[in-house]
Regions:
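Noncatalytic partner-interaction/assembly domains of nucleic-acid and motor enzyme complexes
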Residues: 1-113
């Protein structure tokens, strides 16, 4: 029988895999980072499940650390976290271009699955 698709479980597994590796992980984990960031922008309240375990330092690239910090800030302000709000936060901080622009953020949401 086919395994049921459970996005929350899959994303939790991705978050756990990201945090199990001590220090910075090699560049081949960039795809995992992309999926994690994409999931955070797609799944309501997913930041609550990972904030205790994932810090900006868990991300290998500075761009991903910057995106994660923006997501954390929105969470601390009790604001919704989605593609639009993350884009606007990065734009307000003049960091949107630094992370690859709105199109890169949109691509991150397509990495989940």
């Amino acid at each position: 029988m086919a395994k049921d698709y459970n996005p929350s479980r899959r994303n939790r597994e991705a978050f756990e895999a990201l945090t199990e590796t001590p220090g910075n992980v090699p560049p081949q984990a960039v795809e995992l980072e992309e999926a994690v960031l994409g999931a955070l922008m797609l799944e309501k309240d997913s930041i609550i499940a990972v904030q205790e375990y994932v810090t900006p330092d868990a991300f290998y690239t500075e761009e991903h650390r910057t995106i994660y910090r923006a997501i954390e800030e929105l969470s601390m302000e009790l604001k919704p976290i989605d593609l639009y709000t993350v884009t606007e936060r990065l734009k307000a901080k003049k960091e949107l271009k630094k992370v690859g622009g709105a199109s890169y953020l949109a691509q991150l949401t397509q990495k989940v699955g």
